[in-house]
Amino acid sequence: MKTNKIGVVFSGPILSSIEREIREKESERLKSNLVSILTALDFKNEVVAAGGEIYAVGGIVRDAIMGRSSDDLDIVIRGVPYEKLFSILSKYGKAVDTSLTDENGKKDFGATKFVSHNKTFNEILANNGIRKEIDIMLPRKDSKDLNAKGHRSIKSDVNHMYTIYDDLMRRDITINAVALSYSGRIIDKVKALDDIKNGVVRAVSEDSFIDDPLRMIRAVRFAAKFNFQLDDRTLELIRINAPLLADKKELPKERFLMEFEKMVGKSDMSRAVKLLVDLGLYESMFGVQPKFGDYNKFAHAKSVEDFSYMLFEGQDSNEIVSLVTNNITNAVAILNYVRAIVKYVDEVKEAGLDKLNRTLALAAIYNLSPDMLTTSYYVNSNDKVVGGQFQRKELPAGNNDVEFKGDEFKNFVLDMLEKNQMTQDLSRIGKAKTFALRAIYNDEIGNNKEDIRNFLETNLSWLK
């Protein structure tokens, strides 16, 4: 059993001495603030008087030690039965029971979402960048059901008399298995502090990934997020257990999506995907070999939509949407996005050297996701130049970027219709704009009012 006072700091093997000093000072500040928050809890005195112990756990403690801010406060309270604890919490704020229900409809009665009625306390949270909704839980302890398999074999029991050590030992990786009491004591049974200091991601136990195979993706995510190294035994355990990710009955795709949502934009995506491939997780998850080319493209994935397409780029166009549907999500918005990217990338390939149609397809991709024009290996160096022109507004990426626009353009089109004795059809405005846009893409005219006006006055096919 290992306990540490609040003075333990993050050093990190990848930081310069100046960066380390700054990080250490920030770590001290954040840990001190977290202790102050725990001390300021409205219900603290009554819970302690009832025999309770209060601990901040998980990410917020890990991040404070590392000198990083966090917006979620998770608390474990032991020593007080749930009914009594819930009654106490309800005196001081809005308490909502969020206890889990098992497959037989039985609740475990161990979790509450709490929002304090105390405005001053909520201001303290806000000033520290922490959401006012706090997750409060009783300690849990995992046990195995030998008649079941995978994560279903793990029974998570809730009991107010379990220790904080019991609760920490059920966590996924050591850097998440750390707690902080309101007295400023850090509770660490698994050398979490050493792993944080040395930049290591290590499984809490030999069974961590058997208990829940999604933890392998989570381990990769944290390694990529913090630029930590997976320790040798954890690497070995991931390689051994990677095939467990293929069982979609045990692991619904919604859980994969949740992990990817937490990964995108918050991690070194290029490194994360390379780890997924090198450790055999990619093939186990998706049942195919990767064909997406350069790992560096994933650094540009800013959304789960982009990421979902990039993971399968290079596969047959007809298979990409199916791979996303079968392995990641049925969400209509994501699937429609992936279908659109597939369609426009196919149009880029089909256009070949046809400048007009290629630029139209590139514009369509750009309007969906500017980053795709820097990542897709179907896009050549000239296409990337075009993407830069879109970004700098040197080339219109759509009708709204054509320089001749607004009421002036509308009145010009209506005047042209009148001169040619045609019906004042407002739909002709969009048709004229598209006609001009195509001419700009084809290098027939520049994107300026005079060129566009002269072109439309002398090329009347848009009126037909």
Where are these regions (language model features)?
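Catalytic cores of the polymerase beta-like nucleotidyltransferase superfamily
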Residues: 2-464
